[in-house]
Amino acid sequence: MFNEVHSIHGHTLLLITKPSLQATALLQHLKQSLAITGKLHNIQRSLDDISSGSIILLDMMEADKKLIHYWQDTLSRKNNNIKILLLNTPEDYPYRDIENWPHINGVFYAMEDQERVVNGLQGVLRGECYFTQKLASYLITHSGNYRYNSTESALLTHREKEILNKLRIGASN
């Protein structure tokens, strides 16, 4: 049944990292465990075409500041139902930097094993997010950038969005 659900949704896993045997092995393990199609992309190369419904797993161990800004900028221009998850994230990576990632749906820290990554990705495929409780709390209470991106919210006027944002932070009449 698990395989049937995900083949219907047509998600594709895109692992963005430095190509290596280890990265290829990880991708194969994830594809097999999740019954999902996937491909490896070199983090140093640009990427123009990202298919709708892609789940992007970006390896933070291979990203410097310049690459992080490049990928944030590139991915922020995509609004085709993509989900971004950070992989091998350093423990001390600031929450405020995590909230700058567009379409962020999960963060896997460097100390997490493959099974936790698989379980987290299974949740994301079911429509969930994968964050620590502490990070989720931060995103909910402090972030003006982290918003659920649905077609319904796109139908609101700018003023309606302003009012909702003020309500979110506790303002009243």
Give the residues covered by each predicted segment.
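Preference for well-ordered, secondary-structure-rich cores of eukaryotic proteins
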Residues: 140-142
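N-terminal regulatory/sensing modules of transcriptional regulators
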Residues: 1-138
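Helix-turn-helix DNA-binding segment
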Residues: 147-173
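Short glycine/proline- and charge-enriched loop/turn segments
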Residues: 101-102, 145-147
